[in-house]
């Protein structure tokens, strides 16, 4: 067993003091599942970590970050690394650096900790970005942080919200029965959650239940007026079976044929730009032509690039929209054999 140094003894004495414990317990209430296993027996590290968190609570970001960085040389276990990455993410989020906090929370989450908060934040980011599979994964990880028994009132609110957001992901991926089951769980945990009507309304519309849709819209008018018009427009389209997220749209087959004529003329330019590694310039005209071919897209679609042993792969992303899935299926079915022999195409949800 390693002999305790004088510095360790002083740090332990400070850590065990009433004043320090008062501050530490406040942080434990917020971040316990990450703090508890981190830096076990390393009181010097815990002193630095608590000091950094005190700076966080006062929004003293520069001082807090410099204090937190002192932990970098003290990382030994996965729990230590998880805590370090997570709190770096907290600082990045408070500083408004979205790309950085997303990366840091994601790295912390890979350690499988039991704090729901970063999973919820990452899940919300992916849900807003229409990356529903990743959003689902993070919401399920958040749900797994809670035990089935002994839930506090606050736990039930958070868990109810997680199930509601999970239902939203499942709805967008057309897994309607699973979405309904998640909503039922959300209702049982959090009966009074008027904002949930924004998720319930499209499900009722897909069933053709106009009366239930009206009830949801009335709830939103009273509790979330800022979003009611958007939800109503969506449910009106669903009830009329014209929403491209859920229903196929009329296609102009002459435009589909014209797309391939255009692509044949563009091949040499495309090959040249790809050889120069000017990928964005190469793919932008393809995306713009897709919008011209399928006007219901309303905005330039996502077109990505891959490569395998046969060569380039042009990847079209349908984002789980039924109309786009149908349109791309018809488009690729009409691809001339000559173009198929020179280019590869596939369709991905995300």
Feature annotation, model-predicted:
Residues 2-4, 219-249:
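Terminal, low-structured helical/coil segments at or just beyond the last alpha-helical repeat
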Residues 46, 80-83, 117, 154, ...:
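Start-of-helix register in tetratricopeptide repeats
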Residues 33-42, 70-81, 108-110, 144-156:
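Flexible helix-coil transition and linker loops at the boundaries of alpha-helical arrays
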């Amino acid at each position: 067993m390693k002999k305790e140094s004088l510095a360790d003894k002083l740090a332990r004495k400070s850590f065990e003091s009433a004043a320090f414990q008062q501050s530490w317990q406040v942080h434990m209430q917020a971040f316990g599942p990450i703090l508890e296993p981190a830096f076990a027996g390393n009181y010097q590290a815990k002193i630095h970590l608590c000091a950094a968190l005190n700076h966080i609570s006062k929004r003293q970001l520069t001082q807090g970050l410099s204090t937190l960085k002192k932990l970098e040389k003290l990382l030994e276990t996965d729990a230590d690394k998880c805590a370090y990455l997570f709190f770096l993410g907290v600082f990045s989020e408070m500083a408004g650096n979205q790309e950085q906090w997303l990366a840091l929370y994601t790295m912390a989450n890979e350690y499988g900790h039991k704090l729901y908060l970063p999973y919820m934040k990452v899940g919300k980011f992916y849900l807003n970005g229409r990356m529903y599979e990743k959003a689902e994964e993070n919401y399920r990880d958040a749900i797994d942080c809670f035990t089935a028994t002994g839930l506090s009132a606050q736990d039930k609110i958070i868990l109810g919200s997680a199930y509601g957001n999970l239902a939203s992901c499942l709805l967008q991926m057309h897994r309607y029965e699973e979405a309904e089951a998640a909503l039922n769980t959300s209702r049982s945990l959090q009966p009074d959650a008027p904002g949930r009507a924004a998720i319930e309304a499209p499900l009722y519309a897909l069933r053709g239940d106009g009366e239930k849709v009206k009830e949801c819209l009335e709830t939103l008018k009273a509790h979330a007026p800022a979003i009611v018009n958007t939800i109503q427009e969506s449910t009106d389209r669903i009830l009329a079976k014209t929403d491209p997220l859920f229903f196929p749209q009329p296609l102009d087959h002459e435009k589909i044929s014209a797309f391939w004529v255009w692509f044949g003329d563009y091949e040499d330019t495309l090959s040249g730009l790809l050889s120069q590694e000017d990928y964005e310039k190469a793919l932008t005209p393809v995306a713009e032509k897709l919008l011209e071919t399928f006007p219901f897209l309303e905005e330039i679609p996502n077109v990505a690039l891959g490569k395998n042993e046969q060569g380039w792969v042009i990847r079209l992303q349908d984002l789980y929209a039924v109309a786009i899935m149908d349109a791309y299926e018809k488009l690729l079915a009409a691809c001339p054999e000559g173009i198929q022999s020179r280019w590869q195409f596939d369709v991905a949800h995300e």
